[in-house]
Amino acid sequence: SDGIRLAFQPVRELDAVRGEPLFLPRRSDSAEFPLADTPCELLFRCKPNQPLTLTLGGTVLTAENARLHIQPVLGQDAVDAHLDVNEPIRVILDRGVIEVFANGGTFWAALEAEGDLLTKTVSIAGAEGLKVYPLH
């Protein structure tokens, strides 16, 4: 419908602090890289017919068969949701928080990270079109 639609999206000011992409793997559906003390935004889609796994410190996000599962740390409840695989997933990483936006803005989750997330390594498999933007 063309009516009003509520959606969760990162604030527009985020675009103003986004730098040039840091990491663009070539023809690869997997990558591993340190955050190197840099808050960042990950933007990617699920590779068709493949499971996705994103590991951020002790937090693991998986997607398979149009289902999104986030297994957080620190005693937080796990998150399970339908996933629209045609929409990109945006993950914003800061020192102590992980924010996940999916389904064209109809899904949002904020999770507390274990320790200083920016000292950790990100690992992702099963993604396509991965872009990593530093946030200044």
What are the residue ranges of the model-derived segments?
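Beta-rich accessory regions
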Residues: 1-136
